[in-house]
């Protein structure tokens, strides 16, 4: 088994019973693949597929002018490289994007040419088409300096759907069937029955009309309509009565209205008897062709065709007319014998289309189309052209209607056609086929569709959503271009004069900046990033709305299995509408979710893996992943638990066709991180998966001792760690950079064989948490491709580490853990276990105002020197300054308007000079409740504004750092090149060289060391090939030098050019504060099983319950939090964590007494290879075993994968191994070793019962009391009501609401009440009066009129009631 460099350091012992058959796919694949398909940036222009940008261009171009003599054709497009890299965009508040340029061709035809079009001139040109945001390698976008994610949307697939109203519309509870054809873009077409069984259609949910109008509009006559939907009965008229052509099936079940006889007159069915199968058989045996029927049998039947008098050509009766006695009379007069009527019955052949034809008043195709026109455009006069144009545009024009590839495939499958391709617009037979199926459904044949089935819902990813926006922009451009194309020849225009890129840019900008699906990335920790990018939302444009979504849409559907996680979804109004992709789910070419299965042939499980969509899955019998198989892959059990079409059943192995890939395939990433998930109640598991995303990264991340084995995948795929591109040897490491000398076999000849990784240091995330990378390799380490070189936020040795492992005791403790409160030991705080660093960004801008520019300066009047002590000469705070709430960070003054001066002030100003009072202090201060250390300052200056000293110094420092960086890189590159060169030169024969090297001398190491490195290139080698190699290396070094000089120049240009700032802004200063947050009462904490609580007290370490060996517990939780919540997983985690730590202590004890390596090997083999997945410890060298053991001292990490975890028996074995009987006895353990005797820290007495004690991975959540605590004395007031604002962000007050007023009324506290409702709230004059009185030392309240009373009076007046206050 192959272990990566980091895995060898600390192997996670897995309890999985099944081998890994299919690796978890790259977790961000959906986002990255979708967007690269959209851009096709790396595909040569000629080989681009018609999707994404290419599809948008080809669908809109060529654009032809109205007169047809000029057209604009699209040739290809190209994307330039972005001007700023990702980091620079984030700092400057820019969008990380690339300019899109399209090559277009303007073709002008000769108007004079009489017959065939002749090209007069062709102009080709590249035209700028706006900026396209680019995706970062981790699947997000940087828009205006902030990282955003485009969430995928789950919407109803285009195609045709049949459903009924479940009997809710009509009071009788009758099922009303309906069908809907949904295109990708264009008008929706609905068909629906009403309670009277008449079939209507409507376009775009407008007024409904009889469906036969639509059928006539597509060119069918009433006869053709009836022929399409009915079978006919043939009658031959006799002098008395008639002969009916006998079709046996049509008579079964009917009641005979007369005696039915055979040819000989023998009665087979008597009158009023029901005709059964025996009667039919008798009639068939008698070879009956016709049955004589009386006259009244014909009455009331409906004619299928027009009946025309052969002689006169007169229409006696039309199709769909009822047969009456007068009609029969006319028929006999005209001598017509044969007539056809519609065969209908009440059971499975309803007369629906015939009844609809009756209510339809239109006569022919034109009338039908006019009726549709009037419905679509009421009030407009229907001219012939307008009517035709509108009807064709509705469903037949490619510009206005697009079923899309998916829609056509779904449509054809649903109406039972074999081919899945076809035209993208609607065809006449599509409409007919849909109506036929709908009528069949009403007749009781077939099934309606389930719209929540994942075969009927598809996912739209970033690429597709962006393409739709881009196309919308292009369509706007097309309209403008069409107008101007007419003048193209006369005014000699070029393509760039025709195309205005504004509409495209604004469409793209609006989508990425403010669409409902473009969301501010949740960056609290790596898991929240991954989950956000794997989210699938049913909301958004073209999707559902919260209010309209019913219970069914939100519910878990059997087709979610392996595609969408049944657990992870938000609590609250969005429940079930926002979902997460399952671990192995993947999108097919049509956008439907697929999940992998192992193929089973003749009850033998093969290694072939097939991805099945929800529709395909319904056809197969699929076994669970935990079905028992022998070593040959044969299914063993007599009956295997399996699923078919959403139903679970037990079947024999020979019927199994597929098998699940892994037990964890049904859940999402977050849910698969919960150990013992199978023992938790679903509601708590939901909370657990959601709360892991809120875990704040701790100062020192600690891997969970009990994990699930997916932690490594999670950390690596999130992009928070640094991975090696190529294998090699670590050449240099410091806190900010790792240099790797690449292996010879991976280095490219003639290129530099060095990879340099610059780490991210103390950067602010979107949620103000700290992102910081730390190297985990040492100089000289050998690493291979994909190994983790540095840990990021919340990762420990390349594994996700969201919290800390705490020693937990389940017991009540003086009521401090009542109702989910958490009791924590002071030691946890002292050791900084849950301390986190939060980085706050504070901004100040100097604007150009009407009264003059604002100024950033240290020279601020009426501020004491003490307050300016931390500012430099430019008025900006030093880096490293520790600041508190209210301290000045950046000094700024704003010009004040001239006011009328009193003579005294005039005199003072004349004496003391002008400046005294015409500016006010608007400095940036630290907000209330915040304190911290300044870790970074950035100054942005507008082009043409003089930079201050600080800004210049920041630029100089940055350039100096960059130069050092480049010099280091060059040194490393040169060192590497010269090393390779020396290896090549030693032993070669020279033709001459520096220091009088004789011809034919062999070069040795000593000679080379004596020479300056750059003189090596002057050596003339005898071997031509070697000489060429020498020249190549020289060129490559010079090329690299040149590249570095260019890079430095570019960096200098970027830094020294002015910054793009919003209009009216001259300077902007950003100050970054690092705030240290220690754990304190009021912080929210949680485990991974939805067991959340709030810290109630931090107890001195000496008062905590402790074990017999003196070790105190870290956390005390209430045991009553477990049974009612049914999340027993937490108890099992505690037991297994206890075993993990116990094993770690034993290994630590062996290392301390310097036990022999063999003893360590034996003990490790006992841990790793007794049960569960086997680890290959044989391949480890003694040094590696020693390093492994050192890393295991803090606990042997366990993996208990979801639905395939550790059993009770395995946990028992581990506990026995961790706590031999002597230790168990000393600690007072119970026989199963999962409970311990504890002693009360305050009295030293032993608790009378044993206590469940062990280790649980506990998280601190991003709901910190520091962010919520807030107090106000005076502050901002609302404009209208003059009451204080609400909320911490607005520095608002506490609302004293209606109920609180009742309480004061009940107490009779009248003065307090008066104060609350007037001066403390919205009595403006009273407020100032109180202040005056306090200054005078006169403590009296003069309460006036509350402003809200005036508002009330005004509102009453606005209703037209004259109300006035009687002031007497």
Curated annotation (Swiss-Prot):
Catalytic activity line of the entry: RNA(n) + a ribonucleoside 5'-triphosphate = RNA(n+1) + diphosphate
Gene3D superfamilies in the record: 2.40.50.100, 2.40.50.150, 3.90.1100.10, DNA-directed RNA polymerase, beta subunit, external 1 domain, DNA-directed RNA polymerase, subunit 2, domain 6, RNA polymerase alpha subunit dimerisation domain, RNA polymerase Rpb2, domain 2
GO cellular component, one term: DNA-directed RNA polymerase complex
Assembly behavior: The RNAP catalytic core consists of 2 alpha, 1 beta, 1 beta' and 1 omega subunit. When a sigma factor is associated with the core the holoenzyme is formed, which can initiate transcription.
Keyword Nucleotidyltransferase: yes
Superkingdom in the source lineage: Bacteria
Summary of the function given for this chain in its UniProt record: DNA-dependent RNA polymerase catalyzes the transcription of DNA into RNA using the four ribonucleoside triphosphates as substrates.
High-level lineage: Bacteria, Pseudomonadati, Pseudomonadota, Betaproteobacteria, Burkholderiales
Family listed: Belongs to the RNA polymerase beta chain family.
E.C. numbers: 2.7.7.6
GO molecular function, one term: DNA binding
Record keywords, A-Z: DNA-directed RNA polymerase, Nucleotidyltransferase, Transcription, Transferase
Alphabetized PANTHER family for the sequence: DNA-DIRECTED RNA POLYMERASE I SUBUNIT 2
GO biological process, alphabetically ordered: DNA-templated transcription
Residues annotated as transmembrane: none
InterPro entries: DNA-dir_RNA_pol_bsu_ext_1_sf, DNA-dir_RNA_pol_bsu_external_1, DNA-dir_RNA_pol_su2, DNA-dir_RNAP_su2_dom, DNA-dir_RNAP_su2_hyb_sf, RNA_pol_bsu_bac, RNA_pol_bsu_CS, RNA_pol_bsu_protrusion
Protein name per the record: DNA-directed RNA polymerase subunit beta
């Amino acid at each position: 088994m192959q272990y990566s460099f980091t895995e060898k350091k600390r192997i996670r012992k897995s309890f999985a019973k099944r081998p890994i058959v299919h690796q978890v796919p790259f977790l961000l694949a959906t986002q990255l693949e979708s967007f690269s398909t959209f851009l096709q940036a790396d595909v040569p222009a000629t080989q681009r597929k018609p999707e994404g940008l290419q599809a948008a261009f080809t669908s809109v171009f060529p654009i032809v002018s109205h007169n047809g003599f000029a057209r604009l054709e699209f040739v290809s497009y190209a994307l330039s490289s972005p001007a700023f890299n990702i980091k620079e965009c984030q700092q400057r508040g820019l969008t990380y994007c690339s300019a899109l340029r399209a090559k277009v061709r303007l073709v002008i035809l000769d108007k004079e040419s009489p017959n065939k079009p002749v090209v007069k001139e062709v102009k080709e040109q590249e035209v700028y088409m706006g900026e396209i945001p680019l995706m970062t390698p981790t699947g997000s976008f940087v828009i205006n300096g902030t990282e955003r994610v485009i969430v995928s949307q789950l919407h109803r697939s285009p195609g045709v759907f049949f459903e009924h109203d479940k009997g809710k519309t009509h009071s009788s509870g009758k099922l009303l069937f309906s069908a809907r054809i949904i295109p990708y873009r264009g008008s929706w077409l609905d068909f629906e029955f009403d309670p009277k069984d008449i079939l209507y259609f409507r376009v775009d949910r407008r007024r409904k009309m009889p469906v036969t109008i639509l059928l006539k509009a597509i060119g069918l006559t009433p006869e053709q309509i009836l022929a399409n939907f009915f079978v006919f009965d043939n009658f031959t008229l006799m002098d008395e009565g008639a002969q009916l052509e006998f079709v046996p099936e049509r008579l079964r079940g009917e009641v005979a209205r007369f005696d039915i006889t055979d040819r000989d007159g023998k009665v087979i069915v008597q009158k009023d008897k029901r005709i059964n199968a025996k009667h039919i058989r008798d009639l068939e045996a008698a070879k009956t062709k016709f049955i004589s029927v009386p006259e009244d049998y014909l009455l009331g039947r409906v004619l299928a065709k027009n009946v025309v008098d052969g002689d006169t050509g007169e229409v006696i009766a039309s199709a769909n007319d009822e047969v009456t006695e007068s009609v029969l009379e006319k028929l006999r007069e005209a001598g017509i014998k044969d007539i056809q009527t519609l065969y209908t019955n009440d059971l499975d052949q309803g007369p629906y289309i015939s009844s609809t034809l009756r209510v339809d008043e239109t006569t022919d195709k034109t009338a039908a189309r006019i009726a549709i026109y009037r419905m679509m455009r009421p009030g407009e006069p229907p001219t012939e052209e307008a009517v035709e144009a509108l009807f064709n545009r509705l469903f037949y024009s490619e510009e206005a209607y697009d079923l899309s590839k998916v829609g056509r495939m779904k449509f054809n499958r649903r109406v039972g056609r074999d081919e899945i391709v076809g035209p993208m617009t609607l065809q006449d037979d599509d409409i007919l086929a849909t109506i036929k199926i709908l009528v069949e459904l009403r007749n009781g044949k077939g099934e309606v569709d389930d719209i929540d089935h994942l075969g009927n819902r598809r996912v739209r990813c970033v690429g597709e959503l962006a393409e739709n926006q881009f196309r919308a922009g292009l369509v706007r451009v097309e309209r403008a271009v069409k107008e101007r194309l007419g003048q193209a020849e006369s005014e000699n225009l070029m393509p760039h004069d025709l195309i205005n890129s504004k509409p495209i840019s604004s469409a793209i900008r609006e989508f990425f900046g403010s669409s409902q699906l473009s969301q501010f990335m949740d960056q609290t920790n790596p898991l929240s990033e991954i989950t956000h990018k794997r989210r699938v939302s049913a909301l958004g444009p073209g999707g559902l709305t919260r209010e309209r979504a019913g219970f069914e849409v939100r519910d878990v559907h059997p087709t979610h299995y392996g595609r969408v996680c049944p657990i992870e979804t938000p609590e609250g109004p969005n429940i079930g509408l926002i979902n997460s992709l399952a671990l192995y789910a993947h999108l097919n070419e049509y956008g439907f979710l697929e999940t992998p299965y192992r193929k089973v042939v003749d009850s033998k499980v093969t290694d072939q893996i097939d991805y099945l969509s929800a529709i395909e899955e319904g056809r197969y019998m699929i076994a669970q992943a935990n079905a028992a198989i022998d070593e040959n892959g044969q299914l063993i059990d007599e009956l295997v638990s399996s699923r078919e079409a959403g139903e679970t059943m037990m079947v024999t192995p020979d019927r199994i066709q597929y098998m699940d890939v892994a037990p964890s395939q049904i859940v999402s990433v977050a849910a698969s991180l919960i150990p013992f998930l199978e023992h938790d109640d679903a509601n708590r598991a939901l909370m657990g998966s959601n709360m892991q995303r809120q875990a704040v990264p701790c100062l020192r991340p600690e891997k969970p001792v009990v994990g699930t084995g997916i932690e490594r995948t999670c950390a690596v795929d999130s992009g928070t760690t640094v991975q090696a591109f190529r294998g090699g040897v670590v050449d240099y490491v410091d806190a900010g950079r790792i240099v790797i000398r690449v292996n010879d076999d991976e280095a490219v000849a003639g290129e530099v064989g060095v990879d340099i990784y610059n780490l991210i240091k103390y950067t602010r995330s979107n949620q103000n948490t700290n992102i910081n990378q730390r190297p985990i390799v040492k100089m000289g380490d050998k690493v291979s491709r994909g190994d983790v070189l540095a840990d990021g936020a919340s990762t420990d040795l390349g594994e996700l580490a969201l919290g800390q492992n705490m020693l937990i005791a389940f017991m009540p403790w003086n009521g401090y853990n009542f109702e989910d409160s958490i009791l924590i030991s002071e030691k946890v705080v002292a050791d900084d276990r849950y301390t986190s660093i939060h980085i706050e960004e504070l901004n100040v801008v100097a604007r150009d105002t009407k009264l003059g520019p604002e100024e950033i300066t240290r020279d601020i009047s009426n501020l004491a020197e003490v307050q300016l002590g931390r500012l430099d000469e430019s008025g900006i705070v030093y880096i490293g300054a520790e600041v508190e709430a209210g301290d000045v960070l950046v000094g700024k003054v704003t010009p004040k308007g001239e006011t009328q001066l009193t003579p005294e002030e005039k005199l003072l100003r004349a004496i003391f000079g002008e400046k005294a009072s015409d500016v006010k202090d608007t400095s940036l201060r630290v907000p209330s409740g915040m304190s911290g250390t300044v870790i970074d300052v950035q100054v942005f200056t507008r082009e043409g504004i003089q930079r201050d000293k600080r800004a210049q110094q920041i630029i100089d420092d940055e350039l100096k750092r960059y130069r050092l960086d480049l010099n280091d890189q060059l040194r490393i590159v040169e060192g590497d090149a010269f090393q390779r060169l020396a290896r090549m030169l030693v032993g070669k024969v020279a033709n001459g060289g520096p220091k009088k090297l004789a011809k034919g001398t062999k070069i040795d190491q000593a000679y080379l060391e004596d020479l300056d490195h750059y003189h090596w290139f002057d050596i003339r080698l005898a071997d031509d090939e070697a000489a060429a190699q020498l020249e190549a290396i020289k060129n490559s070094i010079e090329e690299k030098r040149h590249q570095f000089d260019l890079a430095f120049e570019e960096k200098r240009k970027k830094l020294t050019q002015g910054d793009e700032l919003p209009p009216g802004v001259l300077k902007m200063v950003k100050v970054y504060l690092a705030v240290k947050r220690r754990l304190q009462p009021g912080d929210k904490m949680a485990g991974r099983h939805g067991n959340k609580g709030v810290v109630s007290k931090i107890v001195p370490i000496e008062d905590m319950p402790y074990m017999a060996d003196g070790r105190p517990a870290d956390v005390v939780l209430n045991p009553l939090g477990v049974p009612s919540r049914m999340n027993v997983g937490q108890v099992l985690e505690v037991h297994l964590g206890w075993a993990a730590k116990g094993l770690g202590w034993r290994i630590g004890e062996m290392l301390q007494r310097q036990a022999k390596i063999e003893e360590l090997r034996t003990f490790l083999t006992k841990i790793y290879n007794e049960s569960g997945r086997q680890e290959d410890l044989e391949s480890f060298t003694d040094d590696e075993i020693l390093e492994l053991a050192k890393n295991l001292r803090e606990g042997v990490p366990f993996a208990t994968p979801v639905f395939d975890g550790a059993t009770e028996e395995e946990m028992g074995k581990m506990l026995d191994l961790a706590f031999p009987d002597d230790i168990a006895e000393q600690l007072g353990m119970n026989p199963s070793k999962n409970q311990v005797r504890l002693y009360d820290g305050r009295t030293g007495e032993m608790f009378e019962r044993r206590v469940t004690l062990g280790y649980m991975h506990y998280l601190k959540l991003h709901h910190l009391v520091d962010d919520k605590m807030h107090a106000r004395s005076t502050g901002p007031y609302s404009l209208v009501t003059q009451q204080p604002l609400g909320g911490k962000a607005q520095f608002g007050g506490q609302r004293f609401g209606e109920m609180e007023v009742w309480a004061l009324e009940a107490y009779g506290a009248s003065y307090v009440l008066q104060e609350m409702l007037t001066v403390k709230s919205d009595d403006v004059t009273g407020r100032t009066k109180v202040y005056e009185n306090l200054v005078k030392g006169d403590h009296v309240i003069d309460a006036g009129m509350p402003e809200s009373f005036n508002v009330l009076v005004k509102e009453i007046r606005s209703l037209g009631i004259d109300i006035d206050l009687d002031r007497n």
